[in-house]
């Protein structure tokens, strides 16, 4: 059975660090998930826009990694819009260094997930519920989450220092 692909959207150094952390961590918690991230999953020499567009058309789950630095980036809005047009897709904003009140439309339309333990666990349960026959039982999912959470927490903490630009002014 093919793995369920999750598109990880990012823009900027900190957002990239968050997406990289999720890409590494997600398959440890839900083994039937295959995260897709442009930085790692587009072959050298490939037409990157064609590859990204193809992925955006074929995935059912996407995580948009938002930080104070990339809230107003057009690329984030493009990817979120493309993901949301797919029938039965789920688009989750993952807020690193942000509160839900910091996010404005159109991204505010998606129920945001704070990059903390409680909210990340809820996100994992949501992703698991979308796996159509491949989902883990709740007890097993919770055990995997608890086992691997510290790794993600460390990587998210390290990502806090990964921003090379000032946040955009509103």
Locations of regions flagged by a protein language model:
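Conserved N-terminal substructure of TIR/SEFIR domains
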Residues: 1-62, 84-89, 170
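Conserved beta-strand scaffold positions in the cores of enzyme catalytic domains, especially
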Residues: 35, 90-92, 112-114
């Amino acid at each position: 059975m093919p793995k369920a692909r999750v598109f990880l959207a990012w823009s900027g150094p900190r957002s990239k660090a968050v997406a990289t952390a999720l890409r590494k961590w997600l398959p440890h918690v839900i083994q039937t998930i295959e995260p897709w991230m442009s930085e790692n999953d587009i072959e050298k020499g490939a037409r990157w826009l064609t590859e990204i567009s193809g992925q955006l058309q074929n995935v059912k789950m996407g995580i948009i990694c938002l930080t104070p630095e990339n809230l107003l980036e057009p690329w984030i809005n493009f990817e979120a819009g493309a993901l949301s047009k797919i029938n039965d897709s789920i688009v989750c904003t993952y807020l690193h260094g942000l509160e839900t009140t910091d996010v404005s439309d159109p991204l505010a339309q998606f129920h945001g997930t704070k990059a903390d333990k409680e909210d990340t666990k809820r996100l994992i349960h949501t992703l698991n519920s979308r796996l159509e026959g491949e989902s883990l039982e709740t007890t097993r999912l919770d055990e995997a989450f608890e086992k691997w959470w510290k790794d993600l927490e460390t990587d998210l903490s390290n990502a806090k220092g990964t921003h090379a630009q000032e946040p955009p002014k509103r």
